[in-house]
Every structure is written in C-alpha cells, then in structure tokens.
C-alpha cells in the first residue's frame, strides 16, 4: 500500500503535467495567389461538360431515402437514376457556406475551415506501420494512441484525425468506438469520426454528445468525416446513411 507522502507526490506530478499547455499554431493563411493551370475558357468547358453528365447521364443512388429527397428537391428521378438540372446544381452549391467553425475540446484549438485557411491533419487509414528497425508491423490500439498523442503534441498539426493507423487488434464490429475514444482521450484538438456505416456514425455522434453536450452539438460543428462514391457515378446506402447522420 502506498504511503500518504507517495500519494501526494503522484498527485503533485500529475498536477504539474496538467499545467503544461500544448500550444497550437494558427491555421496557415494563404496570401499567395493560386496557380491557375487553365484559362477561363478551359474552365468553362470543363464546367459545361461536368454539368452535361449530371443532366444527361445522371447518377445512381442505391438508397430510397436519398431518392425521395432528390424528388422533393426537384431532380428528375427514374428508378435509381437521378438527373439534375444545372440550375438546381448551381442553387445547391450557392447554399454551401464559405467557411465553418469546427469546435475542439479546447476552445482555443477550434478551427475555421474554408476561406483562405490551410489546415494540417495527419494522414489516415494506414494498414501497417514501420518501427525504428524498419520492420513492417500490424498496428495496434496502443500504436494508434501514440500517434494521437504525437498529433496532440505537434504545434503544426491542427487535428488528431481518427484512424491514423488501423488498430488490427480490435474487431471491426467495435473498432470505430475504440478509434473515436482514442481521438477524444489523447488530444483536445479537433478530430474526425468514422463514417464506415450509418450505425457507426450514430455511435460517433452519441460519443460527441457525451464529450460536448447534446445541446452544444445541435448548433455547433464538433466532428467531421468523409464519404466516398463508387465509380462510375454511384452512391450506395452505406455511405449515404452515414452522411445523413453527420448532417
């Protein structure tokens, strides 16, 4: 059994650790003009060609909820194929905000995303890692935690992301819970959530309610994720259900 002096010593050391504040660099403001690889005419031709594909070929949505939503929005829906008037597309694009504030557990590390802000985030999804002896290893949850801690400590990194490496020592059925908890626990910066299914996305939102409070996340952005379409021109129910949860 530890003595009172030992317990006080541990408490003092913990207090000292908590006093150390990890500063984060602000987002990089892009003040240099963008490189323009195409002239105005080429941009207009590409824009017209892409809108022609959406109008004439369309996109498949393997999701009944999405199909109903597109009908209500005014798109031409036949079966699972949706075709879009270019006026509708431009109207929807115009409704997207130029920037949003992504709130972190530490309010001082919240980020403005968009505008001329450049944000630096760890890569995600690595199936292997390499140790100092150049051995290729299967990542574990402990490895992921270490990467999240490094992301927290590095001033130039603005987010802990989510599965920087894939923790292969945990089953896929609950891996997303471990990944999200590690992101939340080991860094107070912004983080990403798992969108590998609608159910997984719901679990992430429930965890965000615990961390930030249900009322807060109703009106503030606290987590982001990414979804991917299938080639060519197909969206499936798995990705779209996750998108709806995060929206």
Task: Identify what each model region corresponds to.
Residues 1-143:
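Acidic/polar, glycine-rich intrinsically disordered N-terminal extensions of enzymes
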Residues 138-247:
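Helix-rich catalytic cores of soluble enzyme domains
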